[in-house]
């Protein structure tokens, strides 16, 4: 059952000119409500706190004195611009946890496929499964790449793709996914998060090779 509460900002760091890493103290959402990576929180944005924005959870930890959750968001309008101006010690109105996240099993081996701002929700799974995780990360261009170092520290292998070829492989992630599955399809599942066209292409490739996809 989602709860509404005021959460304190304990970290706010720009990742690039339009993307921010924000860590909140979230009460007992992790330990008692099961908040985890891949879910999201509805954060009220604006002085009147009238507009809520769904922000994906990249990491969630039981902690003291309160559980913590790392959220990553892009500045796209007035609401997220307001959110980016929050400072450590400020509080924001949060509703959550919401969404289902991914169904995973201990000891599983996973192919993580993230596109753009769909990359953060998979970070918790990369850090949980580490050498049992392979990641394919796709972005529009080199200046939009986020979290690459975190994924490289965690995963056995990381493949980077950009639409314009300015970093990593030139093209979309689905081509890289197919190349991986042609050589090795021994994955428990593919976990994918990103734009709808990307998800459809990745799901089609997964079906072709008989690998479950979420």
Question: Predicted regions span which residues?
Answer:
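Ferredoxin-reductase
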Residues: 2-88
């Amino acid at each position: 059952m989602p709860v509404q509460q005021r959460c304190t900002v304990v970290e706010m760091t720009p990742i690039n000119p339009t993307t921010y890493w924000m860590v909140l103290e979230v009460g007992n959402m992790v330990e008692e409500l099961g908040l985890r990576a891949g879910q999201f929180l509805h954060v009220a944005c604006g002085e009147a706190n009238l507009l809520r924005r769904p922000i994906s959870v990249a990491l969630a930890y039981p902690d003291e004195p309160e559980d913590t959750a790392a959220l990553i968001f892009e500045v796209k309008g007035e609401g997220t611009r307001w959110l980016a101006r929050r400072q450590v010690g400020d509080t924001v109105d949060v509703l959550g946890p919401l969404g289902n996240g991914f169904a995973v099993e201990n000891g599983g081996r996973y192919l993580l496929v993230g596109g753009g701002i769909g990359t953060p929700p998979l970070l918790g799974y990369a850090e949980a499964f580490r050498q049992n995780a392979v990641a394919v990360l796709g972005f529009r261009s080199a200046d939009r790449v986020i979290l690459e170092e975190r994924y490289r520290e965690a995963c056995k292998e990381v493949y980077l793709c950009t639409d314009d070829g300015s970093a990593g492989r030139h093209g979309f992630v689905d081509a890289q996914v197919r190349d991986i599955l042609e050589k090795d399809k021994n994955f428990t599942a593919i976990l994918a998060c990103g734009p709808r066209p990307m998800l459809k292409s990745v799901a089609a490739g997964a079906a072709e090779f008989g690998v479950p996809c979420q």
